[in-house]
Amino acid sequence: MKAVIVIPARLKSTRLPEKMLVDLDGKPLVVRTYEQAKKSRLASDVLLAVDSKRLLDIAESFGCKAVLTPENLQSGTDRIAFAAKSIDADVVINVQGDEPLIPPEMIDSAILPFIENAALPCATLIQPIVSDVPEILQNPNVVKVVTDKNGYALYFSRSPIPYQRNSDAQPKIFRHIGLYAFRKPALETFTTLPPSMLEETERLEQLRLLENGIRIKCVITNLDSQAVDTADDLAKVKAILAKKLK
C-alpha cells in the first residue's frame, strides 16, 4: 500500500494574511509543515497542493515537491483531490498547511487503519475532551464527534454531543482533529457529491461522507499540534520552535 501526504496551501488567508509564507526561523511556515510531514514513517511521499505560482516557486526553492492547482477550488479537500489525480497513491492523507509542528506520529496513526483494513474508505483523528469547561464544550469551533462501538463516526457537530440527559451517565466526549486520510476512490467520490443538507447546516464537509453512507474510522490520539490561524497562534509556534531549535 502506497500512502502519500498532500498538503493544501492557499496564499490568501483572512485572519493572518499570507500565513503560509510567514517566516519561522528562516523558512516559510508551509515549508516547516512539509518538513514535519516528511518525517512520517508510513507515507511514501509528500506533495504541496498550492493555489498560486508565487507559492509554487517559493516552495520549490526550498526543495519541496509541489503542484499548482486552480485558485477557485471550494475546499482543501477539493484541492488535494485535484492534486491526487497526478500521483500514484492508494491512500491520500490531507495535512493542513498551517501545522508546522504536527507530530509525524499523528499522521502515521491515521494511515495505520488502512494497512489493517483493505476496504476502509476514510479515517480521521479524534481526541478526548478531558475538561467539562463550558467554554470548550459550547465552543462551536471545537467540533465534537460520537462514534459507534467499533470507532466509526456516527455524527460530527459544533454542538455538545451526546446531550447528557442522564446525569449518572459518564459518556466519553471527543473533539475532532482535522486530519483526514482517504483511500483514493473515496476521495474521488467525495468531490463528485453535491454538498449535503447536514454539511451545509453545520458547515462541516465530513458530514457529506456520512450522509452518503461513506464510513469514517476515528482514531484516538493523545498527541497535540498547534495550527496557525491568528497572530497569537503564530507567537505560540515561534516560542515552541525556538526551544526545539536551541
From Swiss-Prot:
Q: Where in the cell is it found?
A: Cytoplasm
Annotated GO CC locations: cytosol
Pathway(s): Nucleotide-sugar biosynthesis; CMP-3-deoxy-D-manno-octulosonate biosynthesis; CMP-3-deoxy-D-manno-octulosonate from 3-deoxy-D-manno-octulosonate and CTP: step 1/1; Bacterial outer membrane biogenesis; lipopolysaccharide biosynthesis
Q: What Gene3D superfamilies is this protein classified in? A: Spore Coat Polysaccharide Biosynthesis Protein SpsA, Chain A (3.90.550.10)
Which CDD domains does this entry report, sorted A to Z? CMP-KDO-Synthetase (cd02517)
Question: SUPFAM superfamilies per the record?
Answer: Nucleotide-diphospho-sugar transferases
Question: What are the EC numbers?
Answer: 2.7.7.38
Q: Name one GO molecular function term.
A: 3-deoxy-manno-octulosonate cytidylyltransferase activity
What are the record keywords, sorted? Cytoplasm, Lipopolysaccharide biosynthesis, Nucleotidyltransferase, Transferase
Catalyses: 3-deoxy-alpha-D-manno-oct-2-ulosonate + CTP = CMP-3-deoxy-beta-D-manno-octulosonate + diphosphate
Pfam families, A to Z: CTP_transf_3
Annotated InterPro entries: Cytidylyl_trans, KdsB, Nucleotide-diphossugar_trans
Biological process (GO) annotations?
Answer: CMP-keto-3-deoxy-D-manno-octulosonic acid biosynthetic process; lipopolysaccharide biosynthetic process
Function of the protein = Activates KDO (a required 8-carbon sugar) for incorporation into bacterial lipopolysaccharide in Gram-negative bacteria.
Family membership noted in the UniProt record: Belongs to the KdsB family.
- What is the protein name for this chain? 3-deoxy-manno-octulosonate cytidylyltransferase
